[in-house]
Amino acid sequence: MAYYNHQNRILARGQIWNLIGETEGLDSGRRHPACAITISNYTLLLARILWEELPFLSHEQCFHTDIFICSVTSKHISVERMKEETVKAIEMVGKVLILVPLLASLVLLLYFNITGSSAEIGCGFCLGTVILAGIVLVGYSVVRSR
């Protein structure tokens, strides 16, 4: 497959990578100046994470803000679905990061209260848990807002 710009010239792999670099900072939905296809920043991020260079795409396979076409795996990956999966993973990690220390601190507090030992360690653990939970929740809200 070949990749065409708006002048119908076939571009080499290195040229494709340079064109991707030129789109940095563009808002989602803006047209790529060199090949007149819509590229979102999230799509570019996926391209950089998953592949060193974009696979060759034909003119008919131009991808838009919600679809990223990977000719290497011959699959259509929905960017919105990838965002949802990322948020779900962050939610799961956030729950684990909050619940595990919280349960551990409760067990420690019970232990210190039963044994009559100093509860300072348990309270410190609880405070750390609250701070960690706050960081996770702020990170989660930032991700959800994007």
UniProtKB/Swiss-Prot annotation:
CC terms in the record's Gene Ontology section: plasma membrane
Bilayer topology term: Multi-pass membrane protein
Location (main, coarse): membrane
Keywords tagged on the record: Cell membrane, Membrane, Transmembrane, Transmembrane helix
Transmembrane segments: 89-111, 121-143
Compartments it resides in: Cell membrane
The organism's place on the tree of life at top rank: Archaea
Listed name of the protein: Uncharacterized protein AF_1577
